[in-house]
Each structure stands twice: as C-alpha cells, then as structure tokens.
C-alpha cells in the first residue's frame, strides 16, 4: 500500500471506502485509443443518449451563451425555472435545478439522509440511488424485483422507522420496465408523510402519449413527493448536464440549502430553455426512438435473443456470456452497456440509435454469435 493509499484508508469514512465508483458507458475516444480505431467508425449505444443530438434551438442558444463565459451564470436559474413553471403549471418555488438530474438525486441524499437513516430502492435500480444513499452514510434497502422492475408492495413493506427516502424510476433504468401510474399513485397514498418518495422520470418523454401522466400535479396531494427529470435523454443535452426536480416548496427549499452555488452552467441553462421551445424536435426524437426500438426488437428476436419489455430508449437483452460478447462487440467498434454491476451478468443494455447504428450493432452481434454459437443456455429463458 502506498503512502497516499495508507493515509486515505486511515482518514476516509468506512462507508465511503465501501462505495464502488459509478462506471459510465465507455467513451468513443477511449475505445479508439485502446484498439486503434477511427472514432468515426465507432458506434456507441451504451449511454441512452439521443442519436439526433440536440435541438438546433438549444445548440444556438448554448453557443450564444459562450460569449459571456467570463461571467457566472444566474445561480437561481430564473429564466429556465420561469419557463418550466409555465409549462408544468407549478410555481417556480417548486422547481430546483440540477447539474443533470443526478445532482438533484444527490441533493435529496444530502438533505434527507444521514447515518442512522435508510433509503429504499428496487433490486435493479439506477446505480446512483445506492451511491447517493451510501455516500452520506445511510443504509440502503434493496427490494427484490418483480419482473425486472419495482415490486411496490414489497417496497412499502421494506419502509422502516428510520426510512427517509424511497427511490423509484418510471420507466426504470437499466431494465426499461414501466409501472402503471395508478399503482404509483396508490403507493404514494400509503407511504408515511415523513418519507420522501423520489420519482425519477428521466425517460418519461419516450413514453407513448397514452401512457404519460401529469405527475407534477400530484405534488399538491403528496407533499412528500419529488419528481426528477432531465434534459440529457430526449432533449439531447447530456454533455451540458442539466436536470430539475419538482416538489412541494418546502422540499425544494431544503434542496436549495444543500445545492452547490452556480451548479448549472450558463450554456446549459440557455440550451435547456431553448429546447423547451422546440416541440417538433422532441416529437422527432420520440418517433425515431419508437421506430428504432422496433428495429432492435425485431433484430434481436431474429437472433433468438430474449429481451425485457422496455418503455425507455434502450433494451435489456439476455445474451448469455455478456462479458465475452461485449468484448467481441468492442473489437468490432460497437459499444453497448454491460450490466453485471447491476446483478445482471447475462445481459447487455443497448441504446436505441439511428437506423444505421442499430443495424451495425445487430450485424456485429450476429457475427459474434455465429462465431461461438454455444452461448449460455440461460439466454433462451423466457422473460416477462
């Protein structure tokens, strides 16, 4: 152990040392360096990014904001919150802005959790939920999944006297599962008022119109509800990092107390505000995803690969020896997401891309499977 390691081991709290760092999807530039590939020849379907990129409105606004980069941004995000307020039908005091929605989740942990408290989340929950929980020394309660998603009955039963937060994603990441809104509403009616329920809707824009719900209106009935949303997915602003939370004004006030100053940069604020004006781009993103999802599902079925029904912009596919198959895909310049860290070692998560990107992945996967047809028999198990 080096001197630095020894000092860190002696001074960092045990709950911090026990945290496994978040592993993002492999960047295109990293794979290019590792294998000597041209970046233009690499397809990345690993991080659920919008293959269309950002709205032209957002891009122009972000570029204009760069002219004032010597100045701090509006720390309160007045203009963006005003536009969100009008769009959502809530008061601006009910909105908190984050450096991506992950920042909002982190604020929740710092405002509501501490050693001696607990948070409840599903077995296959977004990795940031346990990370945020454990970072502040709280206890995480992982509840067994039902059909790869949330079992709300078990999650309600898991709430203890020391529970302060329940994390729910709808649709869920990394599995793509979806809970009917009436089930979530019924769950909220049973949760003790002292417990904050965080409803993560990062992928909400990919839901079919008939499956959408005005959950922002729920905060009047459920003051212990916080809704988390992002501009990183359907809006195509992942690189700028901007998200927001909607909740009771008292909850938002607490989050603002732990929010870092100037946590959303000027270009992100400007781009997000402009993106809200481009409904045509959002509709195009939805349509592209719907078509791409069908392309992926059809191609995977043709390869006899089972998938978990998904309402997001990605699909979870059981391929068997996922680690080996992922390595072979990388050699072919295709980046997808292994999910062994989520307890799903037989699966790969594949983001929906452009038609050509989806075809490139399916062709590469078919090539890999043909080269080693004896894949793990579990890859053929029926999924819900």
UniProtKB/Swiss-Prot annotation:
Q: Which Pfam families match?
A: Aminotran_1_2
A GO biological process of this protein is: L-histidine biosynthetic process
Q: Which domain of life is it from?
A: Bacteria
How this chain assembles, per its entry, is:
Homodimer.
What organism is this sequence from? Thiobacillus denitrificans (strain ATCC 25259 / T1)
Cofactor(s) annotated in UniProt: pyridoxal 5'-phosphate
Q: Taxonomically, what lineage is the organism?
A: Bacteria, Pseudomonadati, Pseudomonadota, Betaproteobacteria, Nitrosomonadales
Mind telling me which PROSITE patterns this protein's record contains? Answer: AA_TRANSFER_CLASS_2 (PS00599)
Gene3D superfamilies with a match to the protein in the record = Aspartate Aminotransferase, domain 1, Type I PLP-dependent aspartate aminotransferase-like (Major domain)
What HAMAP family does its record include? HisC_aminotrans_2 (MF_01023)
Which reaction(s) are listed as its catalytic activity?
Answer: L-histidinol phosphate + 2-oxoglutarate = 3-(imidazol-4-yl)-2-oxopropyl phosphate + L-glutamate
Enzyme Commission numbers on file: 2.6.1.9
Family, as annotated: Belongs to the class-II pyridoxal-phosphate-dependent aminotransferase family. Histidinol-phosphate aminotransferase subfamily.
Q: What class of enzyme is it?
A: transferase
InterPro entries named in the record: Aminotrans_II_pyridoxalP_BS, Aminotransferase_I/II_large, HisP_aminotrans, HistidinolP_aminotransfase, PyrdxlP-dep_Trfase, PyrdxlP-dep_Trfase_major, PyrdxlP-dep_Trfase_small
A GO MF annotation of the entry reads: histidinol-phosphate transaminase activity
**UniProt-recorded name of the protein:** Histidinol-phosphate aminotransferase 1
């Amino acid at each position: 152990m080096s001197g630095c390691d020894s000092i860190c081991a002696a001074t960092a709290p045990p709950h911090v040392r026990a945290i496994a760092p978040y592993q993002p999807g492999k960047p295109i530039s990293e794979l290019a360096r590792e294998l000597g590939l041209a970046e233009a020849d690499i397809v990345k379907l690993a991080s659920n990014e919008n293959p269309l990129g950002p709205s032209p409105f957002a891009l122009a606004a972000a570029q204009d904001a760069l002219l004032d980069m010597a100045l701090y941004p509006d720390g309160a995000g007045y203009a963006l919150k005003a536009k969100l307020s009008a769009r959502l039908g809530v008061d601006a005091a009910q909105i908190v802005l984050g450096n991506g929605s992950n920042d909002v989740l982190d604020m929740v942990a710092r405002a509501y959790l501490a050693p001696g408290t607990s948070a409840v989340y599903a077995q296959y929950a977004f990795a940031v939920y346990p990370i945020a929980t454990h970072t502040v020394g709280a206890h995480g309660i992982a509840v067994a999944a039902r059909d790869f998603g949330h079992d709300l009955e078990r999650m309600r039963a898991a709430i203890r006297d020391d529970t302060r937060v329940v994390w729910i994603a709808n649709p869920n990441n990394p599995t793509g599962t979806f809970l009917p809104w009436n089930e979530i509403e019924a769950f909220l009616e049973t949760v003790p008022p002292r417990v904050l329920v965080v409803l993560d809707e990062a992928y909400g824009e990919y839901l079919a119109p008939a499956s959408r719900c005005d959950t922002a209106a729920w905060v009047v009935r459920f003051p212990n509800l916080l809704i988390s949303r992002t501009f990183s997915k359907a809006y195509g602003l992942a690189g700028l990092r901007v998200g927001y939370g909607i909740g009771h004004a008292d909850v938002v006030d607490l989050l603002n107390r732990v929010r870092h100053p100037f946590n959303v940069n000027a270009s992100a604020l400007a781009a997000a505000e402009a993106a809200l004006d481009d409904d045509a781009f959002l509709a195009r993103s939805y349509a592209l995803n719907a078509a791409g999802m069908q392309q992926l599902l059809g191609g995977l079925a043709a390869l006899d690969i089972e998938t978990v029904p998904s309402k997001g912009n990605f699909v979870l596919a059981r391929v068997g020896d996922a680690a080996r198959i992922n390595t072979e895909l990388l050699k072919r310049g295709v980046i997808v997401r292994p999910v062994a860290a989520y307890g799903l070692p037989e699966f790969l998560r594949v983001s929906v891309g452009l038609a050509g990107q989806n075809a490139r992945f399916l062709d590469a996967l078919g090539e890999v499977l043909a080269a080693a047809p004896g894949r793990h028999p579990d890859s053929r198990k029926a999924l819900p």
